[in-house]
C-alpha cells in the first residue's frame, strides 16, 4: 500500500 511505502521511506532516514 502507498501509505506503508511512505511510512517506510520517512522512517529510513530516522
From Swiss-Prot:
Function: Mitochondrial membrane ATP synthase (F(1)F(0) ATP synthase or Complex V) produces ATP from ADP in the presence of a proton gradient across the membrane which is generated by electron transport complexes of the respiratory chain. F-type ATPases consist of two structural domains, F(1) - containing the extramembraneous catalytic core and F(0) - containing the membrane proton channel, linked together by a central stalk and a peripheral stalk. During catalysis, ATP synthesis in the catalytic domain of F(1) is coupled via a rotary mechanism of the central stalk subunits to proton translocation.
Signal peptide start and end residues: none
GO cellular component, one term: proton-transporting ATP synthase complex
GO biological process: ATP biosynthetic process; proton transmembrane transport
Keywords for the protein's UniProt record, in alphabetical order: ATP synthesis, CF(0), Hydrogen ion transport, Ion transport, Membrane, Mitochondrion, Mitochondrion inner membrane, Transmembrane, Transport
Family: Belongs to the ATPase A chain family.
Membrane topology category: Multi-pass membrane protein
Gene: ATP6
Superkingdom of origin organism: Eukaryota
Protein name: ATP synthase subunit a
Organism: Spinacia oleracea
Keyword DNA-binding among record annotations: no
Subunit structure: F-type ATPases have 2 components, CF(1) - the catalytic core - and CF(0) - the membrane proton channel. CF(1) has five subunits: alpha(3), beta(3), gamma(1), delta(1), epsilon(1). CF(0) has three main subunits: a, b and c.
Localisation: Mitochondrion inner membrane
Amino acid at each position: 500500500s502507498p501509505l506503508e511505502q511512505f511510512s517506510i521511506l520517512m522512517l529510513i532516514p530516522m
